[in-house]
């Protein structure tokens, strides 16, 4: 019987990382079924897209306050959808403000909860580790020291490598001189500006 996975990802970066995770699961479990909140990359892998992250990404205090009713409606809808689908495993990808609430609900239903890409508790809100300990069965962490951090707090954790390494490994490297030529750049140094994970 195929295993049912419900995945919640609320940002563009989570869509990328969630899609790579889905591909990895399918390599081990070709019959795995997916139902998810994510984006186009996850949809390409296959399964049922319930909500697109573009409907979920609210940034900044004011935007969150102005959209609080929508956020609460989304949390309620997500809980109802999980209850109907009854997955074998719930995988939460980053997005802690939303996902920790979903973890608590899923745990109350006896669903296995896996959290992929840890909230940066070691940098802020270390107290949240108690919430994770209570409602998350397993952490899949992307920074080597996070595994020790969680184990110190008696949380099952596995270092799985950084997903951006997967993303860049799919790119074909280009020679710097060729890049400058293609983009009409002179020989001066290039400074890269790398925006965050949310599309605006």
Language-model segments: which ranges?
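Active-site and donor-binding regions of nucleotide-sugar-utilizing enzymes
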Residues: 3-185, 193-200
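Internal, well-ordered alpha/beta segment that forms a basic, Gly-enriched binding/recognition surface
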Residues: 189
């Amino acid at each position: 019987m195929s295993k049912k996975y419900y995945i919640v990802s609320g940002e563009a970066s989570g869509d990328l990382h969630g899609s790579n995770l889905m591909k990895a699961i399918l390599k081990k479990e070709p019959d795995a079924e997916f139902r998810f909140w994510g984006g186009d990359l996850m949809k390409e892998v296959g399964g049922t897209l319930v909500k697109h992250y573009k409907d979920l990404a609210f940034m900044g205090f004011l935007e969150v306050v102005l959209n609080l009713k929508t956020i609460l409606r989304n949390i309620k809808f997500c809980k109802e959808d999980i209850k109907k689908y009854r997955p074998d495993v719930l995988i939460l990808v980053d997005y802690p403000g939303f996902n920790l609430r979903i973890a608590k609900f899923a745990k109350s239903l006896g669903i296995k909860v896996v959290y992929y890409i840890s909230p940066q508790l070691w940098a802020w809100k270390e107290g949240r580790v108690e919430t994770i300990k209570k409602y998350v069965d397993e952490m899949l962490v992307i920074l080597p020291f996070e595994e020790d951090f969680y184990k110190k707090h008696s949380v099952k954790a596995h270092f799985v490598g950084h997903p951006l390494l997967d993303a860049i490994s799919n790119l074909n490297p280009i020679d710097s001189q060729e890049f400058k030529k293609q983009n009409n750049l002179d020989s001066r140094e290039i400074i890269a500006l790398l925006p965050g994970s949310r599309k605006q």
